[in-house]
Design a protein with these regions (language model features):
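Phosphate/NTP-binding elements of NTP-utilizing enzymes
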Residues: 2-167
Length: 167
């Protein structure tokens, strides 16, 4: 009959527990730390990755997005930074919510392409090269190069007679 309480092997004689390959990939992947740091903190992303300081109301806006609030209204005048804050949020979401499909629209085509989407493109150019190089910027779409169908920002207009239907 076997001993129910066998003497354990000395530590030097015990077999090491094999590591999974995925453990090594995670341990050696700086993007894992990047996600931990910025996934729930768009304000820190804007400050450290985009190297700019948002206004207090933009901080509140970004924090509402991070909290998962789906309906956010910003009442303000012209030129105060609504498109800028929206661009920051889209870029943050693109990098930290993979896979993600961000579809953006505006009341008119000129507002969409000349203001909002132009602002997104402007901030993509500000990204550090290690991030900017991961993106392909097109006229109406910004894609993650290696996942162009899984992660993108797309500008879409709608018809005046049916504004709820994006084209």
């Amino acid at each position: 009959m076997s001993n129910p309480n066998p003497t354990p092997l000395p530590l030097t004689a015990q077999k090491p527990v094999p590591k999974k390959i995925s453990d090594d990939l995670v341990a050696n992947n700086p993007f894992v730390e990047f996600v931990k740091l910025y996934k729930n903190n768009p304000v820190l992303f804007v400050k450290e990755v985009l190297n700019t300081n948002p206004d207090p109301w933009q901080i509140e806006f970004l924090n509402h997005i991070a909290a998962g609030n789906r309906r956010i209204s910003v009442r303000s005048g012209h030129g105060v930074g609504k498109s800028t804050a929206s661009a920051w949020a889209m870029i943050w979401y693109l990098f930290l919510r993979f896979p993600v499909k961000v579809v953006v629209t505006a009341p008119t085509s000129s507002q969409l392409y000349d203001a909002l989407f132009a602002e997104v493109k402007r901030w993509v150019k500000v990204l550090p090269p290690m991030f900017a190089d991961q993106l392909e910027v097109k006229q109406d779409r910004i894609e993650v190069k290696d996942a162009n169908n899984e992660a993108f920002i797309s500008a879409r207009t709608s018809r005046a007679e049916q504004p709820e239907a994006l084209q």
